């Protein structure tokens, strides 16, 4: 009887593992098939941005002059909010964006939001590429002679991971971004291992982390962009002021 129970338990566990694996695979496939949204301003955003700009220029306690200097400041803050660590955009992206840096007053004061949305869409694409690259690194783990999984990183090599890249130069090529992210993923893995996790568990944690980031990326909405643009403007005018979208205000 005990033998029969053990066999039944083994079969049950095997079936459960198979179902779980198939479900996880199906989820991954479903996520891969979801495209990035092509975000564009909604009808109400143009009116809202003009009203917000008017409130600041007419009703703020300090005089706000909408000119090229303010436009440049808002542009710089917008880019910083999109890529604070300078490990997503390429230098060529930034060079292209800078052509519109003095047009950002039209973005918030006249409701001509297409420039800001175009930049955001490029950011989403670059982030997707980075997370996909990070996942590809995790899949390169090594199987040792005793069949144990080992991390695909050499932790005996002396390398430096720069956490603060706020003032770092923009990457000149995809290869340069890849190297930045190789070291980032290596640092993420090392932190988990130092916290006591074996590599298989650390890999699982990082895989879930990067896949969740992709999922969140693909759930981006037009209102997310609008809030970021308006916050960039508001915080240049007054560092302690924020714009909260109606959707987020209800949470």
Language model feature labels by segment:
Residues 8-20:
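Bacterial N-terminal signal peptides
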Residues 1-9:
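Bacterial N-terminal signal peptides that target proteins for export
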Residues 4-5, 25-251:
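Flexible, low-complexity junctional segments that flank or bridge functional domains
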